[in-house]
Amino acid sequence: MNTTRARRSPSRIRSLAAAAALGLLLSACSVSDPEAPAADGEGGDATFSIAVGIDPDTFDPAGQTTTTVSNMVDYVVETLVEIDDEGEIAGVLAESYEVSEDGLTLTFELREGVTFQDGTPFDAEAVVYNLERITDPELTVPQGAAFAAFESATAVDENTVEVSLSQPSPGFVSALSATVAGIISPTSVDAEGNSYQEYTRPVGTGPYEFGEYTAGESLTVTKYDDYWGEEPYYETVVFRVVPEAATRESLLLAGQVDMIILPPVSDIEALQANEDVEVLLAESDRTIFIALDNTDPVMQDPRVRQALNYAVDKQAIIDNVLFGAAEVLDAPMAPSLFGYCETGSYEYDPEQARQLLEEAGAVGASIELLTPSGRYVQDAQAAEAIAGYLREAGLDVSVSTSDFPSFLARVNAPVTENTPEAHLLGWAPAYLDADFQMQMFRQATHPPAGLGTSFYTNPEVEALLAQADVETDRDTREQLYCDASQIIWDDAPWIFLWTQSFPIVYDADITGVSATPVEKFDAMYARPAN
């Protein structure tokens, strides 16, 4: 899969983790009815239309929680670096960076001649502003834990930024590739419709400008004429919000959209046989799980949480509900992440589940299982199947289905505010490192500060992860994550379900569509095949 966008032709930058391990100094070389797609438009004045399953909850890079929304924001906002298809750090708005021998100072050399879409210059002061904003404790940054080592940033000159860290942080530069670290125009924060806390119309340096957004219907972005890099083909890109997978598929087959993500998995084989469309079954780093409220009086007992894991036949759900589009988890993270090791197995064992529930005195307990609809592969259908297994084990389970923004509002609320006992969630790290995945199991990321929505904490895990935060030896760091994974697996803060595949389907007359290893589609430079 090609994940390096052609406009950048980035030079490779060795990973910070490797640099710190060697103690070297590194530097890098240089469904309403919006306009229907017009794939054969002359001069690139056509519209490319993409159907997605969820309505965005925020367009502020700092507030990102969801890869689909981040995909939209990426059309407008760029980052200092990106992760290429070989897992290497590549420059985007930063042409190079250096790491001091002690790992505490990072120096970035910025790309010159870049302007924001409001006409203001991209420079070192803008980078300092953005780094200070995403580390501001007064701003809610759900993925901000990755930048915990940030101490300060200084504009050395117009095109040089020096970042000081409080401790070595092997994952810090990789984290700067995530949309949460997207660089926005400081001037735009005070523009009409925006504020520091409520940033709704992003202004970045990307190839497209934010256009019109109608909640529940669509987002339109338009080509930025003064973009510094390669010009995209399409003048306009429309993201249509279509929660029902079958409706997305129908729109594609009727020629009303050019591309969809997450089609009905039951139709994958038929779509693959259809000469009018192309099917991309991309690998994903996303784990799907049932987050259990570990502060709930019933869920506090680890026997209950383990019982719920034994109660669910994950493989049967994958076979019969997901039509094979997933793999059962054997660790608290996907196998594609650095730090993964095979940890264990909760084989389907209804008798063991019932016994543990009886020992814990939890038979008959009432549980609300909250699920989004249209966000993940067969999410609502899977939740119903899981609820059936839990009822068979002796629990009183009700399923609540919600649109995604409302769902996020509930699961990201403080523990005192009517959180559900269980909710179906997916987590796809923005870079392939356990550092990002383990945010889900740290007390510092309990909502609303972060996305640790199970409110799980374990002092042993905290200690191991604190060591991993600063460990520069790759093998030692990997073992620390493996040790933490084993404890988490036994504690069972989640019902560990599966890693899903990421199906993308698009018009066969289109070329230039691919996927990244972190469950994002890459269609920025899509164009007619002929």
Language-model segments: residues:
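N-terminal lobe/hinge region of extracytoplasmic solute-binding protein
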Residues: 51-101, 132, 203-204
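Gly/Pro-rich hinge or "lid" segments in bacterial periplasmic/extracellular proteins
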Residues: 177-231, 236
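Extracytoplasmic/peripheral linker and loop segments enriched in polar/acidic and small residues
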Residues: 396-406, 439-507, 530
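Aromatic- and charge-enriched surface segment that lines or borders ligand/interaction sites
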Residues: 95-140, 156, 162, 298
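Ligand-site clamp/hinge motif
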Residues: 224-270
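Surface-exposed binding/hinge segments that line
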Residues: 109, 145-188, 212
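Periplasmic binding protein-like
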Residues: 50-52, 119, 389-444, 478-480
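Append "and occasionally in soluble cytosolic enzymes with long acidic Gly/Pro-rich linkers
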Residues: 300-388, 392-393, 457, 483
